[in-house]
Swiss-Prot record:
The keyword Ribosomal protein does not apply. Its cofactor is pyridoxal 5'-phosphate. It comes from Rhodococcus erythropolis (strain PR4 / NBRC 100887). Its EC number is 2.6.1.57. Belongs to the class-II pyridoxal-phosphate-dependent aminotransferase family. This is Aromatic amino acid aminotransferase. Keywords: Aminotransferase, Pyridoxal phosphate, Transferase. Homodimer. PANTHER family: HISTIDINOL-PHOSPHATE AMINOTRANSFERASE, HISTIDINOL-PHOSPHATE AMINOTRANSFERASE 2. Aminotransferase that catalyzes the conversion of aromatic amino acids and 2-oxoglutarate into corresponding aromatic oxo acids and L-glutamate.
Amino acid sequence: MTAHIRPDLASIPAYVPGRNFPGAIKLASNETTVGPLPGVRDAVADAVANANRYPDNAAVALIEALASFLKVEPANVAAGCGSVTLCQELVQITCDQGDEVIYAWRSFEAYPVVTQVGHAVSVKVPLTEDFGHDLDAMLAAITDRTRLIFVCNPNNPTGNALSKAELESFLDAVPAHVVVALDEAYFEYSRSDADGIELFRSRPNVVVLRTFSKAYGLAGIRVGYAVADPEIIVALGKVHTPFTVSAVAQAAAIASLAAADELLARTEGVIAERTRVRTALIEAGYTVPESSANFVYLPLGELSPAFAEASTEAGILIRQYGVEGVRMTIGDPHENDAFLAFADTDVAKQAAGIGVSA
């Protein structure tokens, strides 16, 4: 093949989705188990009837619905094919070659990918000892080449959530020309007092990213959104790939916004299960940081590969993060029970380095 391919692509870490195989209990991808919210199926069916037509590239109806729901102006909202595409677009609109993007590590796996694809340089700031954002270190990492900071709150994969006071102090210390993206993919599962929309209102350099993939149950349809200053929204529109937010996605998202009561009931159920699972794991001898998302994190270090492999052999798929830890999605109660039963076995505890009886 004679085509010229960017040489640096060889060093880009490919995004690795959660695995799946027939018959397995899949607790690897932070998906909801209950499907779309009420009204979504009918909205999708109506949209499919016009699948021969291009979607509204401006997503006017969706943006107006989001603006009303969030109590912002339509000029403050952009739609995307999941919030990850908006992450990519933020790098594109803020960074020239060699500019820097700061984020905690470990955090969302897509950050290093979108940064390098955008010809920018990743500045990874290690998490604190309790697996949260080290905001002071992130501030200290800012240079004259810093253009963008990602703050995943709650953090994926560790689950920690920052408070309103912590974020206010951090945001007010960031130079006004540096864009801060508050990635709130798991916002609906958090009961922290931090709300990115409220933090954005008085800070034009703050962008809030949210998605319909998690709590709203639309992971397979792909739709997310950004809330930001109109100048940023206009710039996002200039790099947006046309028609990537399908008519089906737009219709499903609009219908989802009308089911707030059901969404709250579902997220409360997940939170109750999250608490139950974390408590049981701690009682079994595991270290489990407090989580504000729909998953729990086990910081097993170098034992992570062995534990993940043992879990797979038991028919339960979880997410391994190198030699740092593993993440377990909160599923249905019977799925969670299966994982807890595995985690309490001698095989699992030996893999995790937890003492077991002879």
